[in-house]
Amino acid sequence: SSPYVMTSRQINIPYLLKIGEGKIAKIGKYLFDKDMTGIALFWGEGMEKMLGGRLKRGLDEHGIEILSEDTVSSIAVEDITAAAFSLPAGVKAVVGVGGGKVLDFAKYTSYLLRLPYISVPTSMSNDGFCSPTSSLTAGGARKTVKSAIPYGVVIDLDVIAGCPKSFLYSGVGDMIAKVSALWDWKAAFNRGYERFNDFASMMSYNSLDLLFLRHSSDPASPRFQRSLATSLLYSGIAMEIAGTSRPASGSEHLISHALDELAQKPKMHGLQVGTAAYLCAMLQENPETGGVRDILTATGFFDFVAADPF
């Protein structure tokens, strides 16, 4: 076919993006502004106790009705399907609050029902909170399945600041994985195996720059945490633009999946992919290898991983 033929595909990006302090209390206002008056609310374990008061006061103030509320402990597709099709009529949006499990559960629920999904991550451990895929189990096996990118993402930096250090370092590792992932993607394209999307690639690189070139390298600092949140958000959107996880996931993710299967005590996803990304960059003779080493040293990532090795 002619190289000049345009291939058009619909790309969805979040309409509602809020990153800042005290945002949990404002979710009611954001939903009201978008006319989402009835919601299904899914909590991660322990999250309702921690954040329920703040969130529900804001919902009450703006007349937002919780038509269904549940705490999620499973990511089995059978459970998600059952929950999705038992939601009451009148639900205008699905809201997920917590870590990866509940966000994937709520995201896939909204995808099945073609409802807007509002992602409210309580940690910055990876870019899944804004990706167009869900990590679920089907028949006991872990699967990454297509779903829809969130309609909205609300990140409360007060909540992120209270996270254990391991979550922040996991987020750093998931971001640094872009270096080896983008190299792999370009290599596959050069060998004729893949299509390449320059804009998605540029967006993924820019998300790295935003995090590591502009700000402090201390994961405990509020500026770093804001940048980490924004960078992971961009990474999720880059995957949506590319129509593939390639801008964010390469050989380092395959090593992490192998560790999940083989290691006696697998670590958090981002800690594994960050460590693997450095090894992959060396194998690739990636020109960014020195930068990866400097960042993982300066942020304290290497020291953190070394204190409790794989």
List each language-model region with its residue ranges.
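ATP/NTP phosphate-donor binding region
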Residues: S1-A93
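Solvent-exposed alpha-helices and their adjacent loops that cap or buttress functional pockets
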Residues: R9-Q10, K34, S86-A89, S110, ...
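Short beta-strand/turn micro-motifs composed of small residues
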Residues: F42-W43, G98, I155
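Short glycine/serine/threonine-rich phosphate/pyrophosphate-binding segments
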Residues: K49-L51, G99-K107, N126-F129, A248, ...
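A short, small-residue-rich loop immediately preceding and capping a beta-strand
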Residues: L87-T109, L113-S123
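A glycine/threonine-rich phosphate-anchoring loop and its flanking beta-alpha core
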Residues: L112-S207
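Active-site segments that bind and position negatively charged phosphate/pyrophosphate groups
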Residues: F199-A306
